């Protein structure tokens, strides 16, 4: 399986990838995007099985990327890994088609709880 990790911070992408590996998802291919626009292009080209995205990024935000994917007919599983964890943000994410929102700071357990049903 292929996971697309999208965040404008290279360090945060590495932290997400390390946490995925610690949570037991070390046999998945992981690809990276620096913003929502790049992620949108990569979903078409790379066909990931899951997109993990930050919310706030330049060029195109995570929520804009998700909305664009859904408008284009893509049903790729999509979840947020972001510092925005308010009930309003969770509701907006769910209404746009996100399967989950993992709030920073996160643990490997947060990843297992969110991803076990998606990557099984």
PLM region spans:
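Active-site beta3 strand of CheY-like receiver
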Residues: 46-52
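A Lys-centered signature of the CheY-like receiver
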Residues: 8, 104
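Acidic catalytic/metal-coordinating carboxylates
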Residues: 35-38, 61-64
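Alpha4 helix (beta4-alpha4-beta5 surface) of REC/receiver domains from two-component response regulators
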Residues: 64, 85-100
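Receiver (REC) domain active-site loop signature in two-component systems and cognate sites
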Residues: 57
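C-terminal output helix
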Residues: 88, 106-115
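Two-component/phosphorelay signaling modules centered on CheY-like receiver
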Residues: 10-31
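Active-site residues of response regulator receiver
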Residues: 54, 82
């Amino acid at each position: 399986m292929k996971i697309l990790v999208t965040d404008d911070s290279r360090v945060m992408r590495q932290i997400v990838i390390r946490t995925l590996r610690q949570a037991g998802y070390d046999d998945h291919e992981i690809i990276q995007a620096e913003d929502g626009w790049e992620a949108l292009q990569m979903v078409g080209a790379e066909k990931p099985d899951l997109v993990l995205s930050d919310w706030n990024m330049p060029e195109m935000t995570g929520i804009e990327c998700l909305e664009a994917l859904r408008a284009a007919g893509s049903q790729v599983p999509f979840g947020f890994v972001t510092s925005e964890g308010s009930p309003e943000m969770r509701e907006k994410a769910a209404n746009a088609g996100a399967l989950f929102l993992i709030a920073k700071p996160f643990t490997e357990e947060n990843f297992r709880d969110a991803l076990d049903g998606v990557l099984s």
